[in-house]
Amino acid sequence: ANAQMLFHYWKMGNYILYQQNLYGWGGKIINKLAQAIRFNYPEKKGYSVRNLSYMCQFAKAYPLSVLRKLIETDTKSTITSVQNITESVQELNNTVFTQEPLAQIQPADNKETTIMQEPLAQIPDVTGTISRICQIAIEDMERIFLSSPVARINWASHVVILNNPLLLGVRYWYMKQSVEMGWSSNVLKMQIESNLYDRQIKSI
């Protein structure tokens, strides 16, 4: 259930990125989406402006190319020696990812006024939109996401990671540690604030 919720949040975040790239709205799409969900589904929780902003950060941090790279790293990291893990972290930190379809969309001219006049209650087809833009079946997208280490920690832990300026490899290390050590989001926050990764690497 947690992994499916994360996948849904990831899709929502990608939808927001798509709208921002297409129309150049900045934060307006987030406010409108939060209002529309609150209007149509008042019983649904977790769709505040703040949380939708985190979903946007979440999707931006883990596009499909990054998810695939994390899966590849997981596959190669079956031997969990300190040296192997350190090499994996450095490789992720140094990897340069190409732009994906969502990031390549050019802003449209003079479309903001038209869109802003649409009914507030309109709820978008998030899944269909993301599948079309990324040119990949939603089932394949879901398989990639759920196979990645990103799907193995809870949302509160992801928020902790997003709130810290960590390189991809270091984020990966903290995700792996959270799963293996059974850390709560509060423990994870404490470990990041105490620079656990740096301290462990320096102690080798």
Language-model features: where?
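Basic, low-complexity intrinsically disordered segments
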Residues: 1-204
